[in-house]
Amino acid sequence: MQITLMKGKIHRASVTEADLHYEGSISIDRTLLEAAGMVINERVEIYNVETGTRFATYVIEAPPMSGTMSLNGAAARLVMPGDKIIIVAYASFDEAEAKKFKPHVVRVDRDNRILAS
């Protein structure tokens, strides 16, 4: 049996941009991607803390240490710059792996700088 667990999370990041006319995705600072164990093109769930909206998209890389957290394409209609969001990636594990697995949780400040991971 496979069990789906949270693999990585970036907690309470601040949206820096919402670009309706860019190809759909979320651009995330590479430093945050690496700390959360996320990879380019990975499917992620986005939870908007301000509105309660939840949606899925995929990851593209933004420059490291830029603090970028940009929702692009149709997803740009679901956020506003300054909104707090939670970005979560999931993975499937067999039961034995699931019992041992520890997710990467990255907490950030209002400028999307790592506070703790």
From Swiss-Prot:
Cofactor binding note from Swiss-Prot or TrEMBL: Binds 1 pyruvoyl group covalently per subunit.
NCBIfam families linked to this entry: panD
Named cofactor requirement(s): pyruvate
Listed pathway(s): Cofactor biosynthesis; (R)-pantothenate biosynthesis; beta-alanine from L-aspartate: step 1/1
Gene3D superfamilies reported in the protein's UniProt record: 2.40.40.20
Protein EC: 4.1.1.11
Active site: 25, 58
GO biological process: alanine biosynthetic process; pantothenate biosynthetic process
Higher taxonomy: Bacteria, Pseudomonadati, Pseudomonadota, Alphaproteobacteria, Hyphomicrobiales
Gene that specifies this protein: panD
Keywords: Autocatalytic cleavage, Cytoplasm, Decarboxylase, Lyase, Pantothenate biosynthesis, Pyruvate, Schiff base, Zymogen
Identification of the protein by name: Aspartate 1-decarboxylase
Record text on subunit structure and interactions: Heterooctamer of four alpha and four beta subunits.
